Amino acid sequence: MPRKILGVIPARFSSTRFPGKVLAQIANKTMLQHVYERAGLATYLTSTIIATDDERVYTAAKSFGARVRMTRADHLSGTDRVAEVASAENAEIIVNIQGDEPLIDPAAIDAAVLPLVHEPDVLMGTLKKRIEDPREIVDPNVVKVVTDHAGDAIYFSRCPIPFDRDRSADTPYFKHVGLYVYQRDFLLSYSTLPVGPLERSERLEQLRALENGYRIRVVETEYESLGVDTPEDLERVSRLFKASILQGMGNG
């Protein structure tokens, strides 16, 4: 696989619900270090870099040997921050890896990358997972996605899609897993695309691509996204880390 593929982890210190969360400790490492190390296990990433506008994050990343770059502080989204880093790199494919998912599955990263490697006309990709908890279907904080037979997104919504008119028990629902892959040139032009009414209504940035006529390839995964948005989320993830460590000791 000759193409250069760069993983970028946007990492802000400021967070409305949980300031400094990327530097929160989980099993004697910062959350950011866990994300960086997990991303490094992905087979198809040529390299990984952390993008931040905060000296504290920069210093912490350097302390565990990460590649890290300071970016402008005025970016409106993580995508813009990733694009700034991508503009200075010669990678052909860019992966936007969330900095608050310390359990990110390297295999999920690889699965999202592959379509853009094999089909250069696919400009953007992401992931979906089948919903198992019925409560998530009606939860507006869980973004749903429907795709066509080729696996390209038809729509993303906070509403239950599709609408199950006959209340069929076997209607599958899928939630969006927020890892994005871009062909570099498309990423660099993304912020110049006009924002449409669907993106404004749903408050979902990925709808900008669909509203402007671009495909998004959506790969199904078994990876259960466990993002850390609150101190309570951190406690839950910390318990999972402790359980996995104890399990590993028991198997040793």
Curated annotation (Swiss-Prot):
EC number: 2.7.7.38
CC terms in the record's Gene Ontology section: cytosol
Presence of the UniProt keyword Nucleotide-binding in the record: no
GO MF annotations, alphabetized: 3-deoxy-manno-octulosonate cytidylyltransferase activity
InterPro entries: Cytidylyl_trans, KdsB, Nucleotide-diphossugar_trans
Coiled coil: none
Biological-process GO terms, alphabetical: CMP-keto-3-deoxy-D-manno-octulosonic acid biosynthetic process; lipopolysaccharide biosynthetic process
Catalytic reaction equation(s): 3-deoxy-alpha-D-manno-oct-2-ulosonate + CTP = CMP-3-deoxy-beta-D-manno-octulosonate + diphosphate
Keywords: Cytoplasm, Lipopolysaccharide biosynthesis, Nucleotidyltransferase, Transferase
Superkingdom: Bacteria
Cystine crosslinks: none
Pathway assigned in UniProt: Nucleotide-sugar biosynthesis; CMP-3-deoxy-D-manno-octulosonate biosynthesis; CMP-3-deoxy-D-manno-octulosonate from 3-deoxy-D-manno-octulosonate and CTP: step 1/1; Bacterial outer membrane biogenesis; lipopolysaccharide biosynthesis
Keyword Membrane recorded: no
Biological role: Activates KDO (a required 8-carbon sugar) for incorporation into bacterial lipopolysaccharide in Gram-negative bacteria.
Family statement drawn from the similarity comment of this UniProt entry: Belongs to the KdsB family.
Official protein name in the record: 3-deoxy-manno-octulosonate cytidylyltransferase
Source species taxonomy: Bacteria, Pseudomonadati, Acidobacteriota, Terriglobia, Bryobacterales
Originating gene: kdsB
